[in-house]
């Protein structure tokens, strides 16, 4: 089966939430989108609240990924523990609330793995290596049983995003980068 995936990032502020609420379901239907991953870490400009996460689900997001603004709205911590459809970067160092990857049911019984990782270049966060963390997750039996594995790599530098894409080539079905809120000027 051909799986049509839509990756949306980063949803910024009320304007981003509003356009998603008005257009995402229509787009999913028009383009026969089966699974949608939305980076929602800027839904409240910096960070996301549980109410905003629920709004993204209502708009049509299947999974929400986060990034360097994960902890800007402290009320999200409990939500991250309870809701398996919202992911924070898997490579945050130490014990932090939530999960960095998930396995979800797709159409026709497909198992879809989604991994959320964050780059370390020019991002001020306490992070383990995203490359080592990717390896650890991809060695897990439950992830290996997935039909499709998708990776949202939240990073500043296009060089780091490109390195991750090459590193995961042949091991996952898709890698995309989120975070930079403007188009790149380096031909990427």
Regions found by a protein language model. Give the residues of each.
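Acidic, metal/ion-coordinating pockets
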Residues: 1-188
């Amino acid at each position: 089966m051909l799986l049509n995936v839509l990756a949306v990032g980063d949803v910024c502020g009320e304007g981003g939430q509003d356009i998603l609420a008005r257009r995402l379901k229509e787009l999913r239907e028009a383009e026969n989108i089966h699974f949608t991953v939305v980076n929602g870490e800027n839904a409240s400009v910096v960070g996301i609240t549980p109410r905003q996460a629920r709004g993204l689900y209502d708009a049509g997001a299947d999974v929400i990924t986060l990034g360097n603004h994960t902890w800007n709205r402290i009320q999200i911590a409990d939500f991250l523990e309870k809701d398996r459809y919202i992911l924070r970067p898997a490579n945050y160092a130490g014990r932090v609330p939530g999960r960095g990857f998930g396995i979800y049911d797709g159409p026709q019984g497909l198992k879809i793995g989604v991994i959320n990782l964050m780059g370390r270049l020019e991002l001020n966060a306490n992070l383990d290596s995203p490359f080592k963390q990717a390896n650890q997750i991809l060695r897990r039996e439950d992830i290996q049983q997935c039909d499709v594995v998708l990776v949202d790599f939240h990073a500043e530098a296009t060089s780091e995003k490109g390195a991750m894409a090459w590193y995961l080539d042949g091991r996952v079905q898709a890698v995309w980068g989120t975070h930079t809120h403007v188009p790149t000027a380096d031909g990427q």
